[in-house]
Amino acid sequence: MSIPLYLYGIFPNTIPETLELEGLDKQPVHSQVVDEFCFLYSEARQEKYLASRRNLLTHEKVLEQTMHAGFRVLLPLRFGLVVKDWETIMSQLINPHKDQLNQLFQKLAGKREVSIKIFWDAKAELQTMMESHQDLKQQRDNMEGKKLSMEEVIQIGQLIEINLLARKQAVIEVFSQELNPFAQEIVVSDPMTEEMIYNAAFLIPWESESEFSERVEVIDQKFGDRLRIRYNNFTAPYTFAQLDS
């Protein structure tokens, strides 16, 4: 009976066994060439892996350590992928998607994924916005203590929302104008929290990261304490390595 395999990622070049990596359940990570693709894997000790912080970080660490070793072009596989044998990989992944896998490798060659998440204090922004729009502030203040119709409540709420959205878009536009020219491809995702106003990944030339990072720093200084910027400059290219359904 074959031992199930936990998969981490796919590479266009062979990964030597001299690269020592520790995977999930503290199992050694190996490489296996299937057709023309090199897979990083370890023996699976569980049928299903819990998406705990430790397990997720271990999965990411395997890929990032491989990238640090010089194998920068890769297709990261989703966390928790366990297969029973390599024949399953041939029949379910390589045979139906071989051309697309090669196209993804070509797209990612010489490129890296970086990501930006921008946060602001929603309450502070609302207060600042009201202070800069005295007519809107006066309109809201005049309504305090009064019995309002549903139409009046909706109207003032919409005016506030429109002005906050304009402030948000003005911030995003600064980032877009400065950073978008670096990117071959950009994916903007939905914010994950109320405080997050922008969540984007950029596929940029590998050697452009230092200049990209400097631009982020300049923007950060421009906005000061108004924003919190979370910049990730080293990650496997999950966003740009998606197979079409």
Swiss-Prot record:
What's an example GO BP annotation here?
gas vesicle organization
* The entry's keywords: Gas vesicle
- GO cellular component term, pick one: gas vesicle
Location(s), subcellular: Gas vesicle
From which residue to which does any coiled coil extend? none
KW Coiled coil (keyword) present: no
Q: Does the keyword Cell inner membrane apply?
A: no
Query: Where does the protein principally reside?
Result: other
The cross-references to InterPro entries, in alphabetical order and at most eight, read: GvpL/GvpF (IPR009430)
Q: Which residues cross the membrane?
A: none
Top-rank taxon of the source lineage equals Bacteria
Assembly and partners are described as: Binds GvpA.
Chain's role: A minor component of the gas vesicle, may be involved in preventing GvpA aggregation during gas vesicle nucleation. Gas vesicles (GV) are hollow, gas filled proteinaceous nanostructures. During planktonic growth they allow positioning of the organism at a favorable depth for light or nutrient acquisition.
Which family would the database say this protein is a member of? Answer: Belongs to the gas vesicle GvpF/GvpL family.
Name by which UniProt lists this protein: Gas vesicle protein F
State the organism of origin: Dolichospermum flosaquae (Anabaena flos-aquae)
Taxonomic placement: Bacteria, Bacillati, Cyanobacteriota, Cyanophyceae, Nostocales
